[in-house]
Amino acid sequence: MNNTAWWIIIFILILLILAAGEIYRETHTFRVRKYKVKTKKNIGIQNCVKVIFLSDLHNCVYGNKNDKLYKAIQAEMPDMILIGGDMLVAKEGSSVQEALEFVKKLPHICQVYYTNGNHEQRMKENTDIYGDTYERYKAKLENCGVCFLENKAENIEKNGMKFSIYGLELDSSVNRKFKKADVTEKTVEEKIGKKGKDYSILMAHNPAYMDAYKKWGADLILSGHLHGGLVRCPGIGAVVTPQGFLFP
C-alpha cells in the first residue's frame, strides 16, 4: 500500500472520529435558545409571559437525575412550562422512570402543560404491548400537578394576558415513515374544535402538517419530532427527518 492510500485511510478515520465526537456532543449536551414572540393582537399584555418549551428528550438525562437541565429551567424563572411530547421511549423493555422523575419535579417551578408525542401515543394505544404503563405514567404526573392536553384546550390568564393553549393529538398514521397523511384544517378542527377568539398557542408534535395548523388559525405553533434532523450537514442544517423526508 502506497503513502497516498495510507493518508486517505488516516483522513477517513479522523473524519469518523470527529463525526462520533459531534454525535456524542449533540446527544449529551443541551443549549437554551431564546425567542421573543410579538403579536399585533390586543390581548391585554401588561408584562411579558415567559414560556419554556421542552420536547423529545427520549429519556435523555443531563447530569445526575437531570439536575443540569432542571437548574437551567429554574434559572430562567418561567411563568409556565409546555411539553411537546416524546419525553420517554415507547419500546419493549424501555423504562419511563427517567422521564417520570424529571417531569414530576417541574411543577415545583411553575404550571406544566403536556401534549403527547408519537411515543406517548404509541404506548397509550398499544396496551397489548405496554399494558397500562402510559395510564400509570400520566396519573403520577397529574398527581404532581401536570396538566395533560390530549385534544383539549386550557384558557389562561397570566400577567394581564389572556390566551388559550391547545394540545393536538392526531392519529398515529400521521407519523408513518416515508408517507405524509392527509391532514387538513378540518382534521385539526375535528380533534380540538374551532379556534377561540383569544390568542392561541397550539402544541402539535409533528410539524410536517404545519399548513393545516396555520389554516386552523393558530397564532403560535410549537412542535418537536424532527430533533433538528436525523442527519445534519454544516451550512445546510437538517437533511433527513425521522419520517424519512428530505430537507425539512
Task: Annotate each predicted stretch with a short phrase.
Residues 1-45:
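N-terminal membrane-anchoring alpha-helices
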Residues 38-52, 146, 153-165, 195-197:
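Beta-strand-turn-beta hairpins that frame and shape the catalytic cleft
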Residues 45-147:
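Membrane-embedded segments
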Residues 54-59, 85-87, 118-120, 152-153, ...:
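Active-site metal-binding loops of divalent metal-dependent hydrolases
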Residues 57-62, 89-93, 177-180, 199-200, ...:
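Short, flexible loop segments at the rims of nucleotide/cofactor-binding pockets, characterized by
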Residues 79-80, 113, 146-147, 163, ...:
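Short, Asp-centered acidic motifs that coordinate Mg2+ and/or phosphate
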Residues 124-145, 158-200, 210-211, 216:
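Binuclear metal-dependent hydrolase catalytic cores centered on His/Asp/Glu-rich metal-binding motifs
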Residues 143, 201, 206-248:
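Conserved beta-sheet core of the metallophosphoesterase superfamily
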